[in-house]
């Protein structure tokens, strides 16, 4: 698989994501449903703590990727839904630490509410 970042305006690169990712020669595509801060039994965790919810949502995303034989390095698109979009942007260091040098296309969407006590939900598309 070949990934080519598309950034006609480079300001997003410093934030750790690309405006678009052109993927060629991939074999499989995994489309992940929204992942949030739940434990293995589906019970909501970390009410009121955006950072902890984001970390656990990433853990859950990584578990799905691993079950498909993939890692965060295979993610080409990450949609972030949050009850406070500005707070998520302030927490981008968490995403950058987990994704490392792997950049992806992303949208951060502020939403009025999420189920249960969730503050953030992640949807991902991964390819290999």
Which sequence ranges carry the predicted segments?
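N-terminal presequence-like segments and the immediate start of the first folded domain
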Residues: 1-59, 63-76, 82-128
């Amino acid at each position: 698989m070949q990934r080519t970042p598309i950034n006609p305006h480079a300001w997003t690169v410093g934030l750790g994501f690309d405006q678009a990712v052109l993927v060629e020669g991939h074999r499989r595509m995994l489309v992940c449903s929204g992942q949030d801060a739940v434990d293995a039994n589906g019970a909501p965790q970390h009410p009121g703590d955006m950072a902890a919810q984001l970390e656990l949502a990433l853990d859950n995303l990584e578990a799905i990727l691993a079950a498909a034989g993939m890692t965060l390095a295979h993610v080409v698109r990450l949609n972030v839904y949050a009850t406070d979009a500005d707070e998520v942007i302030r927490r981008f260091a968490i995403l950058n630490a987990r994704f490392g040098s792997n950049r992806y296309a992303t949208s951060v969407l502020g939403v009025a509410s999420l189920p249960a006590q969730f503050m953030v939900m992640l949807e991902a598309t991964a390819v290999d």
